[in-house]
């Protein structure tokens, strides 16, 4: 069997992954009847339901909706569950290039191997965490572009309760290592408050909010003040998680723009640019920056002085520019405000009350440690296709000569402080340097060919498929 090898690495502190994902699958839905009342289950089925027999999700009467629970099929990898241990981006690229041709496409058995069970099952996740150097993790659902569009308030509340109960049960496999961020039914603010108190009693530390204006429900409106008060009282962090604005479940005739990233998607589409992932360069940051500027300059954090927030999956390099601009424009126009004056500069509020996520290949934060000292929290984004392990983040930090004290803060300490979570009694110190792989694993020559730009468009030279070697490709030199 081929062996994928990695250079030895070590760390002397526990890590905390502030934003990793589970994939909502049949395992999530099969607990609905046990965790919901009869009335809640009825409301759920009328609004959103997953049929385990057909593998189809129905949302607001629309069949085959949503992006979670994708079936494992030959010739495709699941982008929501592929980034398990050692699944580096060049390997994913090589397999995607294989899938361009029927003759080289992966089989269903091979696709199942790449569909990492940790995205659905906690025992498998804990094993993967040991390899990936992840000591503690905050799990977040995947299908956050679907849920804000559920039309019925009771149905949305039932969905959130169903997911949150399943996520809590998932965490019980090792409650010192796995934590969950709760979904909240913003369609009905009163239900969102009740659900927040309920999950807080279960030890939940984060309430998730998608910063979009779905059905006129942008999460800064006065009708949500009760929710922010509840977050203050419970200490639950306002978890702001953006996403590309597909908007596939917008009601017929709904023409309002619901997200800044919707404009980005339309711009690329009208320009004839075919690759959907090109929008990711701007989508996440656009939703996050619009929310942050609005929250800071509207005085949200001054009206709720014990409210704390975390920005997820938006990178962090843009933040220094945005905070500088917020300070500059507040100074310029504060005498023209029709709102109450702020008690301190927007940047000062952010540094006191917020943290921002970053992923391991994002280099600028490690070069600007004074700015990010207390606000930076690492995210793996595992098991999504762009996810990676703590060792990748450490490589980036080592190149910037970042001190070990700051490595410890960025990779765990800041997140635990923000969430008020204690460090684990034990933690992973040394990297796993070898992973046994199946015979069909991509060879290095195949990866080299796949990484050429033309490989995604033109037929590449025929690589050798399934040729085992003593060392599997895709490790690190």
How would you name each of these model-derived features?
Residues 21, 26, 142, 212, ...:
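Flexible loop residues that form catalytic
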Residues 152-157, 393-396:
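Short glycine-enriched, charge-decorated loop/helix-capping segments at active-site entrances
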Residues 15-19:
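Short, hydrophobic/glycine-enriched beta-strand segments
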Residues 151-153, 324-327, 399:
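A short secondary-structure junction motif
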Residues 158, 171-179, 184, 189-190, ...:
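Catalytic pocket-lining loop regions of alpha/beta-barrel enzymes
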Residues 108-117, 127-151, 177-185, 205-212:
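Divalent metal-dependent hydrolysis catalytic cores, especially in the metallo-beta-lactamase
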Residues 20-21, 381-382:
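Active-site metal-binding loops of divalent metal-dependent hydrolases
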């Amino acid at each position: 069997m081929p062996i994928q090898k990695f250079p030895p690495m070590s760390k002397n502190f526990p890590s905390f992954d502030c934003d990793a994902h589970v994939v909502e699958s049949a395992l999530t839905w099969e607990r609905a009847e046990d965790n919901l009342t009869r009335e809640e289950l009825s409301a759920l089925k009328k609004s959103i339901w997953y049929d385990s027999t057909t593998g189809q999700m129905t949302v607001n009467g629309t069949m085959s909706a949503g992006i979670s629970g994708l079936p494992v099929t030959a010739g495709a990898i699941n982008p929501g569950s592929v980034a398990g241990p050692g699944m580096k981006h060049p390997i994913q690229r090589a397999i995607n290039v294989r899938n361009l041709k029927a003759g080289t496409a992966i089989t269903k058995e091979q696709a199942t191997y790449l569909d990492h069970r940790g995205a659905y099952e906690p025992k498998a996740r804990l094993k993967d965490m040991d390899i990936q150097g992840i000591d503690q993790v905050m799990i977040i659902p995947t299908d956050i572009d679907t849920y804000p569009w559920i039309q019925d308030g009771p149905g949305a509340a039932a969905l959130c309760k169903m997911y949150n109960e399943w996520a809590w049960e998932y965490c019980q496999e090792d409650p010192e290592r796995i934590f969950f961020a709760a979904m909240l039914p913003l369609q009905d603010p009163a239900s969102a408050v009740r659900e927040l108190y309920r999950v807080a009693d279960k030890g939940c530390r984060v309430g998730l909010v998608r910063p979009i204006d779905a059905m006129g429900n942008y999460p800064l409106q006065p009708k949500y003040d009760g929710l922010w008060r509840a977050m203050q009282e419970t200490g639950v962090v306002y978890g702001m998680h953006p996403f590309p604005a597909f908007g596939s479940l917008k009601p017929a005739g709904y023409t309002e723009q619901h997200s800044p990233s919707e404009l980005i998607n339309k711009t690329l589409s009208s320009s004839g640019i075919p690759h959907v992932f090109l929008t990711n360069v701007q989508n996440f940051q656009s939703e996050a920056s619009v929310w942050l500027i609005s929250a800071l300059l509207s005085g949200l954090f001054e009206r709720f002085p014990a409210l704390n927030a975390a920005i997820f999956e938006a990178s962090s390099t843009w933040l220094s520019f945005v905070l500088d601009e917020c300070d500059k424009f507040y100074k310029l126009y504060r005498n023209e405000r029709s709102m109450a004056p702020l008690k301190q500069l927007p940047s000062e509020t952010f540094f006191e009350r917020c943290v921002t996520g970053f992923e391991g290949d994002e280099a600028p934060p490690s070069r600007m440690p004074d700015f990010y000292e207390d606000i930076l929290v690492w995210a793996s984004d595992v098991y999504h296709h762009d996810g990676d392990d703590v060792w990748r983040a450490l490589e980036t930090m080592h190149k910037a000569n970042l001190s070990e004290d700051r490595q410890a803060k960025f990779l765990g300490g800041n997140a635990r402080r923000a969430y008020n979570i204690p460090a684990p009694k034990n933690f992973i110190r040394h990297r796993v340097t070898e992973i046994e792989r199946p015979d069909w694993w991509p060879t290095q020559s195949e990866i080299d060919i796949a990484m050429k730009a033309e490989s995604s468009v033109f037929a590449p030279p025929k690589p050798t498929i399934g040729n085992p070697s003593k060392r599997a490709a895709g490790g690190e030199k």
